[in-house]
Amino acid sequence: MVTIHLQPRDITMLSLLGDVGILDTERLHARCFAEVSLRRCQQRRKLHTEQGLIRSQKLAVWYGDQSGRVPTLFTLTERGADVVAETTGLRPFRVHRSEPKPETFHHRLAIVKTRLALDDGFRSLDLNPPQWIMEQDRRPDAKPDEPPSQQRLLYHPFSSGNVTITCQPDAARRMSIPRDAARAETGMIDLIAFFEIDRSTERRGQVLSKFPGYAALIEQRGWLRYFSSATAAPVRVFFVCLSQQRINTLRECLSEHPLASVLRFATMLDLTSRHPLTDAIWQDTSGRRREIVRVTAPLAH
């Protein structure tokens, strides 16, 4: 086996994998090896895999919305996590210990794409990106004999009479955002954000079935379990969809729902905006486009 001398960008890559959980070739190259060719990046990745630092998997099934090669996905191994811990003093949180189904990989990669786009939006405003809670993150007190879904930090059960309803967002974050990005003197506010990655596979009834859980989560402020000091923060539920047509369908389905005012919709393409926080890419149920962070004057970018 060839010995590899780890460079700072290698540690950056391993740390990023341990933070977001999964990356594809495109994002791994762009974020960790942008100064070298794709071929050189692939050669380096091969060494990482041979050394047992990362795990690669080419999906047998790909539901991509664009033609092209089936992506290879990368996750951090326990050995890779050990290397990061020894080098930085911080052990990565998200290490894959099993092989999820292809559809789970698809879903988690879409969550990561959303996260990275919004993190870039925070950096564009000279703000540190908030921490995320991802769908696979486990409760500290989770028991091994519990069903996997119930071990998740974002699993919220609520009693409604003799029935238990649940809410399981795909991701969550507590955002501390400017009241006005152009006027620092206006200060900051908190926003609790939940995310739903919509793959256009759920029918109307399946979509609507999510909302008793969201209603209970918002009414009972279930996020205080992990965002304990955000007692008065407003809530938004952000749907990230594959197409505008799908957004139109969801808007029609949800426009009269009691939670309509907290819903926002954008496409994956919308998230390629350079400024996904201050650009009006998020549609409400009426179709009006809104921003997450208000800006009353042009920003110097």
Describe these PLM feature segments.
Residues M1-P102, H301:
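Nuclease-adjacent, charged terminal/linker segments that flank catalytic cores
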Residues H5, T201-S209, E219-H301:
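Non-catalytic C-terminal interaction segments of nucleic acid-processing enzymes
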Residues G64, A117, R123-L191, R203-G213:
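Active-site metal-binding core of divalent-cation-utilizing nuclease and nuclease-like domains
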Residues D82-W132, D190:
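Amphipathic alpha-helical dimerization/coiled-coil segments
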Residues R173, F194, V237-F239:
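Structural beta-sheet core signal
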Residues R174-S176, E196-T201, A216-E219:
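Extended serine/threonine-enriched, polar tracts that run as long, contiguous segments within proteins
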